[in-house]
Regions:
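Conserved glycine-rich cofactor-binding loop
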Residues: 7, 14-16
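Short C-terminal tail/terminal secondary-structure segment
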Residues: 98, 226, 237-250
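Substrate-binding pocket helix/loop in short-chain dehydrogenase/reductase
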Residues: 99-101, 105-113, 194, 206
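Active-site helix of classical SDR
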Residues: 124, 159, 167
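Alpha-helical segment proximal to the catalytic Tyr-Lys
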Residues: 129, 172-176, 234
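Residue(s) in the substrate-gating loop at a strand-loop-helix junction
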Residues: 142
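A conserved structural motif in NAD(P)-dependent oxidoreductases
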Residues: 210-221, 232
Length: 250
């Protein structure tokens, strides 16, 4: 197994892409800390699926937009599996809402930046002291971070562009310590994110505009994340990998 006895923390790991990442890491032998914020039922189902397949995992509820939350998450990982962390996958994030510029107030700005960038920054800062050479960090950016996003998604796009730049900066800073840092820039993936924030006709138009003529599946994004966390990607760092069905070739 490629992750045998390695310790992995997955933020937002209870549902959608995060669930698939948690399942796939556990299936390859990792001991997984599945973090979630609010949806306990989905997180518990993720744990059930991992254990039913013979994997090892624990759940930990934490708000990873706060220092206290991420410190508690790291403490929970250490209590369950020991002092070291080998893999961090930052999947926590979200749109919050679609708003044009003149409807964005300070509170909304903070909420979007917190859930998408601050969470990634804080969790990385808390986990890195417990990583050693050979560890890997995988962040979730977005296609929106490259192209500015769709209507009402400007702030979301900015927050994900920050994740992309943070990924490159951390790759430079942590590379001499043997820690790799990469990110995924996902396009249209079939998750609750688009169920909540994208109209069906827009989803269909976006899917039709890709060479593959469909949305991506959560497990397809998770496969890329797991690859980036593995030794198979041992000479990859600082990459923002497009997982978008070939959008830019359309």
């Amino acid at each position: 197994m490629k992750f045998n006895n390695k310790v992995a923390i997955v933020t937002g790991g209870g549902r959608d892409i995060g669930r698939q990442v948690s399942l796939k890491l556990a299936a390859e032998g990792a001991k997984v800390v599945v973090n979630y914020a609010n949806d306990a039922a989905s997180a518990e189902e993720t744990l059930r699926l991992i254990e039913a397949a013979g994997g090892t995992a624990v759940l930990h509820r934490a708000d990873v937009t706060t220092p206290e939350g991420v410190d508690g998450l790291v403490s929970a990982a250490q209590a369950a599996f020991g002092p070291g962390v080998d893999i961090l996958v930052n999947t926590a994030g979200g749109m919050v809402a679609r708003k044009p510029l003149l409807e964005i107030d300070d509170a909304f700005y903070d909420s979007v930046m917190d859930v998408n960038f601050r969470s990634t920054f804080l969790t990385t800062r808390a986990v890195v002291p417990h990583m050693s050479s050979g560890a890997a960090i995988v962040n979730f950016a977005s296609q929106a971070g490259r192209d500015g996003g769709g209507p009402g998604a400007s702030l979301y796009a900015v927050s994900k562009a920050a994740v992309m730049t943070f990924t490159r900066a951390m790759a430079k800073e942590l590379g001499p310590k043997g820690i790799r840092v990469n990110a995924l820039c996902c396009g249209m993936i079939s998750t609750r994110f688009h169920d909540d924030f994208t109209k069906p006709e827009v989803r269909q138009a976006v899917a039709n505009g890709t060479p593959l003529r469909r949305e991506g599946r959560p497990e397809e994004a998770a496969d890329v994340a797991v690859f980036l966390a593995s030794d198979a990607a041992g000479f990859m760092t600082g990459a923002n990998v497009d997982v978008n069905g070939g959008t830019y070739f359309s």
